[in-house]
């Protein structure tokens, strides 16, 4: 890599690191580009050379965290052979990753409300990606008989929602414990939820599936 290109890349990363600190301290709306430039030890023009505006910096930080999370999850899942073990590995990695990036967790999951439609769309996309990942492994678990048949789309959303709520509670706590210590409890609750389907009468599962199908069929009512 040419020296000038390397310096540009290093400056780009330095700006993002500085932005993480400033955003985490002042929040998205309270942060000025001038403050990011000062923290990054560069000029305001130097920041704008890499990013057209504050929102672009924010989105780049979000993408950075999402990429880290995705890579770690894929690596952990690839080491497991059983579908439930893969889902458990994904859960564990998500908690471990947020545990080591508390500033970013608080920033994106708590303080980013109102950051704009582009950020909201990106957040929805990321949530859907990870919910689909969980659903894939739950589908595999159903297929091999590891868990009883169930509405895996709803179960995956519930899993993601539970993780999301635990991370938010930890991120805003004044004296948070270790996020990764929550793993055994969350794991037990989530696995108990999907395995409890085997204790339901057969027609109960059928009714859930029928209701889910009806919801899918009427899903466009809100747009009419």
Where are these regions (language model features)?
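C-terminal peripheral helix-coil segments that are non-catalytic and often amphipathic
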Residues: 2, 93-100, 131-132, 136-143, ...
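Amphipathic alpha-helical linker/stalk segments
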Residues: 3, 61-90, 134, 138-143
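Helix-turn-helix
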Residues: 14, 18, 22-56, 60
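Hydrophobic alpha-helical connector segments
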Residues: 60, 74-103, 155-159, 183, ...
């Amino acid at each position: 890599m040419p020296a000038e290109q390397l310096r540009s890349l290093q400056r780009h990363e330095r700006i993002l690191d500085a932005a993480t600190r400033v955003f985490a301290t002042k929040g998205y709306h309270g942060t000025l580009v001038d403050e990011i430039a000062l923290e990054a030890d560069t000029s305001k023009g130097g920041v704008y050379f890499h990013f057209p505006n504050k929102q672009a910096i924010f989105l780049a930080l979000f993408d950075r965290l999402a990429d880290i999370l995705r890579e770690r999850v894929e690596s952990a899942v690839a080491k497991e052979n059983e579908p439930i073990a893969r889902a458990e590995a994904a859960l564990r990695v998500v908690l471990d990753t947020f545990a080591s990036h508390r500033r970013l967790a608080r920033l994106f999951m708590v303080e980013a409300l109102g950051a704009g439609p582009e950020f909201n769309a990106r957040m929805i996309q990321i949530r859907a990606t990870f919910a689909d990942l969980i659903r894939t492994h739950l589908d595999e678990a159903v297929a091999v008989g590891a868990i009883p048949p169930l509405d895996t789309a709803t179960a995956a959303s519930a899993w993601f929602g539970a993780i999301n709520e635990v991370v938010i509670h930890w991120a805003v706590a004044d004296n948070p414990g270790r996020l990764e210590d929550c793993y055994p409890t969350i794991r037990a609750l989530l696995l108990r939820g999907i395995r409890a389907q085997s204790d339901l009468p057969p027609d109960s599962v059928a009714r859930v599936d029928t209701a889910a199908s009806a919801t899918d069929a009427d899903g466009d009512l809100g747009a009419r």
